[in-house]
Amino acid sequence: VAVARVHLKHPSRVSRHGLHRILGDGGPPLSRVELVLVNLEPHKVALGHRRRAVQLFELPLHGVALGDDGVGVLEMGALVQHRSDLFGLDKQKILGDGVVTGYGTVNGRLIYVFAQDFTVLGGSLAEAHAEKITKVIDLAMKTGAPLIGLNDSGGARIQEGVVSLGGYSDIFYRNVQASGVIPQFSAMMGPCAGGAVYSPALTDFIMMVEDTSYMFVTGPNVVKTVTHEEVTAEELGGASAHSTKSGVTHFTYPNEISLIEGLKKLLSYVPQNCDEEPPSLPYEPGDEMRQVLKDIVPENPNQPYDMKEVIAGIVDENTFHEVHKDFAENMIVGFARLAGKSVGVVANQPAYLAGVLDIHASTKGARFVRFCDSFNIPLLVLEDVPGFLPGTDQEWNGIITNGAKLLYAFSEATVPRITVITRKAYGGAYCVMNSKQIGADMNFAWPTAEIAVMGAKGAAEIIFRKDIKAAEDKAAKLAEKEAEYSDAFANPYRAAYRGYVDDVILPEETRDKLIKAFSMLENKAVKLPKK
């Protein structure tokens, strides 16, 4: 079969689905299907009447922009068709069955891609469609390369009945088998409803496009029918809802082009598979002292500050790539580089809810820690945590079990793990945030660190309650006892005496200490008990 590229006269009018491939008898055969980046509105190609056996197949933009040097993806299964003749499907046999699958390179690294095409039967998933996706996942597993899914589907193809559900299950099973073995990314380029949402949910990272992507198990019409609640698709499952309320999506972008660029950037921090190290960049050692870190933490322990300024002062310039930016903002997670090497950053954010741990912050942190541990990415923890968020809402919704997820994730992680305590480290939250006792390799503290069971005021009210009750001036007595407790514990030295902290360091020397410590831990090897 000869494959010819269509040269478009008006690329500005081409849709995001507007990459066209003509199968016919003209021109020399090509060894691959070249995917060309196109954008914007629909464009149709007029076919000559005398061309034999011509099929027009629109490939979505999604798989296009990933390849190196403008070269796209080498397509597999381009001639696959569905095998159903029920409910008019016999008249809708389109080559590829609504999904493009293939492989290519990004920054010289092998990747596998599947890209659903909503213009073909609504991107609906059925037997042949699912078989193409499962094949590309199997190949990604065999060759140890990342998998990228570009989702744009209305759900199951109901004309094919139960085989559509079987196809979903085949994909889900492979997503689970690949979890922690190869990195998996899901880019939502359009609607994703019903069973279609569960494959992205099983992958490592989900990306959405504002005003274009939608994810929901049941759509607005079903919600209205069952619950009589009126809600728009955007309100129910748009990028904003999932980035701020549910936490389903890890990244949101204004358009598909910026999403593709974000995906490339994310790939630069992660390895090909669980047996490889993450990619590093050349780095020339120099003066690693960072004076900018000296004055970030306020003298008043109750005054907030932005932990992102601390992160920026420690890691290589402009390398911090935040994950889940708008969800559970009291916890910061993301990738960065330290002396050219990829690291995962987990940090409390004192500027939001004082940096407390709550349900969402705990699950957000735990998921990120487990990803980094699966793919050999060292962990840097920056700690300023006053405890867990109190209240009936938290208790009734499972702060105990959800808080334990972060504890579990750190405890089972075998990658190099270093903690820097910048200020507060109180109570159970101190234990959870990669403490020495749950396997942290190195723990540093700034002179401003306070490592204690609780804050000075609360501790004084409990320990000295009889003295305070008996005092004529209760407020003055409380202040006196609060100062007494603070003098004893509002510093890092008592913990250092016990060996819970390896060194008390000045803020400006943090970067230098971390570079040397992570270098020392490069060959760390831990074998956990077999399960």
Regions found by a protein language model. Name each.
Residues R52, G67-K531:
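Ligand-binding clefts of soluble mixed alpha/beta catalytic domains
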Residues V1-V71:
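Intrinsically disordered, low-complexity segments enriched in glycine and mixed charged residues
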